[in-house]
Every structure is written in structure tokens, then in C-alpha cells.
Curated annotation (Swiss-Prot):
It comes from Capra hircus (Goat). Its main location: cytoplasm. The gene is RPL21. Keywords: Cytoplasm, Endoplasmic reticulum, Ribonucleoprotein, Ribosomal protein. One of its GO terms (molecular function) is structural constituent of ribosome. Residues 112-123, 136-145 have a biased composition (Basic and acidic residues). GO terms for cellular component: cytosol; endoplasmic reticulum; organelle membrane; ribonucleoprotein complex; ribosome. Component of the large ribosomal subunit. The ribosome is a large ribonucleoprotein complex responsible for the synthesis of proteins in the cell. This is Large ribosomal subunit protein eL21. It is found in: Cytoplasm, Cytosol; Cytoplasm; Endoplasmic reticulum. One of its GO terms (biological process) is translation. Belongs to the eukaryotic ribosomal protein eL21 family. Pfam families: Ribosomal_L21e. Residues 112-145 are annotated as: Disordered.
Length: 160
């Protein structure tokens, strides 16, 4: 068969609804509030065809730059051959959700502020940079009365 060039080509599983999640869209989807500067994940919902993003934006993360009654404008990076372009797309709110990618950072900022405040009260210095995991502590290995066995490689023999 020939290769069709439709907008939804190859989206059989991409835009399909999860198991037991078909039918009416939950109202919580419409109750979420989006503001300028919010970071959102784009995920096309097959039950709503209006305002659906193109399949190339499915799974991408962008920043909200415009908010209207039913949709939001999002700036998303898209790779076109060798360059990355900042694309502005309009997507209805059924097809987006707040991204969790920034949550850990914001949590760390709050913790650091708390540490700074406590350190200032005590008049001490505090380490705020994240440190890599240190090497494990030294420990003895139990042999349960057995003698450790020395392993040696077998010498190479050329067989012709």
C-alpha cells in the first residue's frame, strides 16, 4: 500500500484512550488553572478532536505564553533537521497537563531557603549544593567458616 500523508498517520496507539478510561472526559480536566509561564506536558486525547496538537508535539513539554477561554498557547521546541525551533502552538486544555518536571526543583528551593534561615539564626555556614553519593563504608564479608577461593584466569593456549 502507498504511504498516506494524513495528520493522524501512525497514531493508532498514541491517541487511543487507556483501558477503562473511554467515554466522557473527567471534569477535573477542565477545572485545572493554567497561567502564563506554567510548564505543561502535551498529550493528545483521542476523545476530543478539537484543538488537538499535531502528533509531533505528543509527549513534549512546553511553556504557556497565552491563555484563552478554551485553549492555551504553548511554546515548544521542535527539531527540524539540524536546528531546534521554538514553535508556538494553540492547544485545548484537554490535551495538556501540568508538568511534574519542575516539582523536585521547587521543593529543593524551599528546603534550601529553610536551611539558610536556620543557619542565619545560628550564625553558621550550610552546604546547599547537592553532593554525589559517597563510596560505601568498609565492612567485613562473612565466609561462614569457608576458606576464600583464589580465582585465576586460565592461560591462553593456541590450538591450530
Amino acid at each position: 500500500m502507498t504511504n498516506t500523508k494524513g495528520k493522524r498517520r501512525g497514531t493508532r496507539y498514541m491517541f487511543s484512550r487507556p483501558f477503562r478510561k473511554h467515554g466522557v472526559v473527567p471534569l477535573a480536566t477542565y477545572m485545572r488553572i493554567y497561567r502564563k509561564g506554567d510548564i505543561v506536558d502535551i498529550k493528545g486525547m483521542g476523545t476530543v478532536q478539537k484543538g488537538m496538537p499535531h502528533k509531533c508535539y505528543h509527549g513534549k513539554t512546553g511553556r504557556v505564553y497565552n491563555v484563552t477561554q478554551h485553549a492555551v498557547g504553548i511554546i515548544v521546541n521542535k527539531q527540524v533537521k539540524g536546528k531546534i525551533l521554538a514553535k508556538r502552538i494553540n492547544v485545548r486544555i484537554e490535551h495538556i497537563k501540568h508538568s511534574k518536571s519542575r516539582d523536585s526543583f521547587l521543593k529543593r528551593v524551599k528546603e534550601n531557603d529553610q536551611k539558610k534561615k536556620e543557619a542565619k539564626e545560628k550564625g553558621t555556614w550550610v552546604q546547599l549544593k547537592r553532593q554525589p553519593a559517597p563510596p560505601r563504608e568498609a565492612h567485613f564479608v562473612r565466609t561462614n567458616g569457608k576458606e576464600p577461593e583464589l580465582l585465576e584466569p586460565i592461560p591462553y593456549e593456541f590450538m591450530a
